[in-house]
């Protein structure tokens, strides 16, 4: 129950305050409460957690890289806060989840709670954008308005992995009730994601659609239908206007031109600091001497590329660890699709689609490196492993 509440509260990292000198969030307090309850229950019933799993070694490597990144960061206090929020607590939550998700029923509760979180951010943000469209106050050249998060991209980054999992459940779950719940979530979340006008989010949605089509025996027809549907959506006036800025390289609102400059400056910085990057929270300061105009350098916290994000924050060691985690997620999902109990199997194509969508979206954005996204990521890995962990004595994959 505590784990489900924590999943439902993932967007609540925006609710912040201090307990004495210690800054915290509602999400962090929920994570800590879940861990305390788990520890008490473990000691009470003298359970022995299973630490060894396909994600243990890459998780330890990621933690090691993060600890080094704290040491090399220009602001150790800020870096320690990010280490705690993006690495230590989500990874600890992962180990809690793989112990408590001992049945598909429990896993479904966690997924349902993530769905509640997704709907909670989808409806108000979509309503605000629709109101702006209705009053003709939306400027497609600029970021869409948001309610809960600071940017519309943050909404898309949170929703896209959940849309991937929900799409798989809607397609493969044999029970009608499960399909209806997943479809109901998609009916709300997909339009909300489109209304963020996030170009990276659109790429992620396209990857999910193509991936689902490729998994069907009529893949050629469905891939063609997916591409036609994507083209039709891209011609909706506000979306077409938003995308139009990206094909005009002379347009001052073309974000790809700015991204290219940012990536170039980042690569120059990494050429000089290949092992450790800029350290956790150190990207702004690290990138400043490398030719990026001052106003852009002040606004950018990450290089907006999934490879460069991990490299600049946690060094080459962290990049290797993050890539290892993604590979392990796909490997576990493939095994789960073949070997897990039938009730778990519809989850696994969704895990693969979520990883693919994250990578595609991450070509131009910042997946993982936020409080909610890191918890969502590790919860997804926990769900993937739990289906194999609890299938019976034969589940001893290392």
Residue ranges and their predicted role:
Residues 17-20, 72-81, 194-195, 363-368:
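Membrane-interface helix caps and helix-loop-helix hairpins in membrane proteins
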Residues 1-68, 77-78, 102-112, 170-179, ...:
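Transmembrane signal-anchor hairpin modules in multi-pass inner-membrane enzymes, especially those
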Residues 34-35, 60-71, 88, 92-93, ...:
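Alpha-helical transmembrane segments of multi-pass inner-membrane proteins
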Residues 21-30, 82-86, 147-160, 311-315, ...:
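Membrane-interface micro-motifs in multi-pass membrane enzymes
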Residues 2-9, 333-364, 384:
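Loop-to-helix entry and N-terminal half of a specific, functionally important transmembrane alpha helix
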Residues 11-19, 72, 136-148, 296-309:
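Juxtamembrane membrane-water interface segments that cap and precede transmembrane helices
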